[in-house]
Structures are given as C-alpha cells and as structure tokens.
C-alpha cells in the first residue's frame, strides 16, 4: 500500500551555509565596518549579534535573504526577544522549528479526511503518515495539503510504493 510522510523540517546543511554566507557578507559590508555584527549557530539555534536594534534588523534581513537564496523556508524561524548585552550591543536568539506540532497534525488529518480522497492519515510522533491504495490519490493529497496549509512549511518524504 503506497504511503508518504508529512513532515516539517528545515535542511540544516543549507541553514549552515546561509549562516556562513551571511557572516561573510556582514564582514565585507561597509555599513557594518567596525561593528561586532555576526550570526552564530548552535545546533537548531541561531544567535544574531549587533551594535543596536537597527543593525540587528539589517543582520536579520541579510540572513533571511541568504536563506531564501538557499531555498530554506523562513517560516521555520522562531524569533525570540531582543536582549541587551554589555553597553549598546544587542542579541536575538532565533530557534529553528522542527516537526509537525500536535495542532498542525490534527489539522492535516482533518483536511485529509474532509477531502473525501480515499486515503488514511495517522499521526506518528512528529510526522503524519498518509497511505492509500493508489499513487494518484496520494499525489492529489499532496497537492491539496500544499494548497490548504500555508502557515507552516510542509515537506513530503519517505514515499513508499
């Protein structure tokens, strides 16, 4: 019986590349000359450092631009509070979301069941498994979910025939 998994996970290799490119651009830009602006990554957590709120916004814009170029959906980013650190410097912690939350999983299952497509959806941890008799039904389910769920980036993987 063909099936696939609905997951929500950022490509961490591309995130790392985007962070490195952002740091490279920040180090060469004229408006950041002499400032301590940078982006650091620890696992699924990014920390943005800058001299003031305005420069922090610019660092954020550079990071978002680099992520968009590397096809990393910026809806994965969850921005924390802006914190003041020593003097005028500020930092902001950005976490990268992973997994389909319980509410989103229930929403996906409800959309699949209400669609009257002959497939079954079941929640399995931080993913939703969709299985059906025909491959065409699964492909129409993928199209339906891409159209209906716009607030969270969804990936479809583990396609089994």
Curated annotation (Swiss-Prot):
Keyword terms, alphabetized: Nucleotide-binding
Top-rank lineage group of the source organism: Bacteria
GO cellular component labels: cytosol
TM helices/strands, residue ranges: none
Listed InterPro entries: DUF520, UPF0234-like_C, UPF0234_N, YajQ-like_sf
The keyword Nucleotide-binding appears for this protein: yes
GO molecular function terms noted in the UniProt entry: nucleotide binding
UniProt family annotation: Belongs to the YajQ family.
UniProt name for this protein: Nucleotide-binding protein BMA0373
